[in-house]
Amino acid sequence: MSKYKKLFKNAKFWDQKLAVIFVVPLSKTGITPNQITFITLILAIFAGYLFALGDQNSLNYGAAIFVIARFMDNFDGMIARIKNMETKFGYFFDYTTGGISFAVMYLGIGYGLQDSTLSFWAIVLGIAGAISSLACLNIIFR
């Protein structure tokens, strides 16, 4: 069984199966799993910035970019397995950027919604969400 068919068969969720379609051509390029992880982090930070702007268009674009970033998070591990590039650093980097991505999203949404009916509580909830995302990293790496 080819590596690609095995990836597709082992994919548990629909987004992982869909990701295989993108991973196959990407795996034939020089891009590394850690580069993909870094790209997803940059996209998530940009999405957080858009969330922080708070207007409807920015919130919508921020949401779309964040979904794309999280979808692309499937790519790095798959490419690492295909290219036999799995490392402890890559595993740590992937999980850390995932936690940071969610923290930035919560902070951005909280800041962006401070002028809504939530007012001050939007920021409090954003900070609470960010702290919980980062706390999960602490639990994972114990």
Question: Which residues are covered by each model-predicted region?
Answer:
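Residue-level recognition of pore/gate-forming positions within transmembrane alpha-helices
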Residues: 41-44, 70, 130
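Juxtamembrane/transmembrane-helix boundary motifs in multi-pass membrane proteins
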Residues: 28, 53-57, 86, 90, ...
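Acidic (Asp/Glu-rich) catalytic motifs at the cytosolic membrane interface
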Residues: 57-110
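A feature for the membrane-embedded catalytic helix bundles of lipid/isoprenoid biosynthetic enzymes
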Residues: 1-23, 95-142
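Juxtamembrane membrane-interface segments at transmembrane alpha-helix termini
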Residues: 52-54, 73-81, 134-142
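Topogenic membrane-insertion module of multi-pass membrane proteins
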Residues: 1-61
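Hydrophobic alpha-helical transmembrane segments
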Residues: 38, 60-64, 123-127
